[in-house]
Amino acid sequence: MTSPKDNQTAKPVCFQDVILRLQSYWAAQGCAVLQPYDMEVGAGTFHPATTLRSLGARPWAAAYVQPSRRPTDGRYGENPNRLQHYYQYQVIIKPSPPNLQELYLGSLAAIGLDPMIHDVRFVEDDWESPTLGAWGLGWEVWCDGMEVSQFTYFQQVGGHDCRPVSGELTYGLERLAMYVLGVEHVMDMPFNPPGSPIPLSYGDVFRQAEREYSRWNFEQADTGMLLQHFKDAEAECDRILTAAETDSAGRRIPMAHPAYDQAIKASHLFNLLDARGVISVTERQAYIGRVRALAKRCADLFVTTEAATLQAEDAA
């Protein structure tokens, strides 16, 4: 691993520069730089590179950008820092290295936030994801009084204890970049370098989509169809999980990942139904419980499959 001090550079000039610097920094620390998961998720944690790979004994180190959707947070592109579609940067390392906090501070320096100059504080705030049956001990990270990241040591995912414990970092990219670039409204933030042949702001790229999706999320999404799709995803997840573990050629191939895709779909459909206002307080808890049950069963299968794979490797 390289020293965080090697990455102390001048401040970025645009949103994509912040992302590129984080990618370069964590690649230099030995993380596999992955691509976003190709499904609608509410947070970077839902990526199987975090949720599933935090389970079991195999070492793991990955970093990636994840587009995330929270339909209820839509504000038609008018709120300065609240969006229904936004980006997170996710880092997951298992087992968690003893110097993870130092590495994190080095990542801030890499994007121009020198911890020796800025007031960086770790405010105790344990993390929980009810739909994933996951929780961890951790902190919100504040820089000069503004939350910029979440720092978590995973204790449990899908109802399974994390052994070894994974260290997870989540950066809110828009909020962090706005702070680094000194921008008051997310839509005014330069997306690419201002000196580019075609300079684009964040608003140039996303404002119209934010307006349209806000209307669709709150007013136009077909609730009857969404309810049926939720049932379909739930049923398909169950079908995959209960399918025979051997394929037509007699190979043992349980399907935790395809099943987990359906759990992700169910979670996003629940979020859309919540935005449409058709789920009561009582029903909300029941829906969360249904998604959590799916995620737990996917985790069960992943853990069982990995244990069998490791046993086979040891015997070979």
From Swiss-Prot:
Identification of the protein by name: Glycine--tRNA ligase alpha subunit
Organism: Paracoccus denitrificans (strain Pd 1222)
Biological-process GO terms, alphabetical: glycyl-tRNA aminoacylation
Keyword Transferase included in the entry's annotation: no
Record family assignment: Belongs to the class-II aminoacyl-tRNA synthetase family.
Signal peptide (UniProt feature, chain positions): none
EC number(s) from the headed UniProt entry: 6.1.1.14
HAMAP family (alphabetical): Gly_tRNA_synth_alpha
Reaction catalyzed: tRNA(Gly) + glycine + ATP = glycyl-tRNA(Gly) + AMP + diphosphate
UniProt subunit comment: Tetramer of two alpha and two beta subunits.
Major place of residence: cytoplasm
